[in-house]
């Protein structure tokens, strides 16, 4: 018999079943053998179905149910909400809950962020609290009236300490210019949530080596990986002069004791001589390899590593038909399941030439972990096409059967949806 597409182990198993049936049911008798073969084929069909389902269990994730809702509407002519990202207190804890940080942003000016706000989803009543500002995450004003603000933040559960650790970056803003300082510095910033009081610690700065290249250093909009010993692999990017300088990306190994985040080392520095270089890197661990996706002004890139610190030369993101992803100047993030890995992104070619930087709809595709290409046939829309688009979004694994993707709608007007959530049900 020929078993198309089955492993040697499966072929052997099917052959053994057929042999046993023929031996037990009289294969020497032609009439009986004819009946036995039919019976065997029935058995083989069922076994083949089970084995095919086992082989294709990853493909069962290809068409999840996606439900989109609006968590917040814009309420002011002066501002809208951006950078909504969720950290999940796991269900094996006494009080599982989701904690979202988000940021009110002035409609006038560029990067005119206010202090971070927090919303909490209680697993008992399944409701969200209204956004609350915390003085610990507020803007800080220096003697010259310049504003330093904690931005681009991502909350994530740290299992070793049982804390939600919020990581991001700082921006220096000039209220007179209504924009960030062109040559202003930046630091990797963090805060820790007290789960009992739902209060954040005053935001602090990660101490990096005293080198000029770290004058502008950030962990903005990044996804990190926590190691079994509690150490953290935190993607960062840095450039000497400011936001508009050329940046390099690397992964920093940090230690977190539940209160203080400390730098230990960082791996090889990834660079590209194209516009602002590599920014907003996000990291994941899938099937024993660390994958790093990188934003660039013109194209997105991906690199891999076995130790989470030393990465391959970045390659342009492509689909498995060889075509480029056609995303640009916008972050990408990972969605990782035990047996499948997805990339979330925005791109050209979706009847969206009227959208700023083609930042909607928000899409996802499964990653071929061997080639590091995206499987075009698995591409799905996660969030719809909307005027002005998304771009600044987060991904949170709520449970083994549910993933949330949260995004802020650029320049939403009063009454319009400002914070969107996609519930991906596996």
What feature does the model see in each segment?
Residues 7, 12-15, 35:
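Serine residues within intrinsically disordered or low-complexity segments
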Residues 9, 19, 50-51:
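Residue-level detector of intrinsically disordered terminal segments
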Residues 18-47:
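Bacterial N-terminal signal peptides that target proteins for export
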Residues 58-61:
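Sec/Tat signal peptide C-region and signal peptidase I cleavage site
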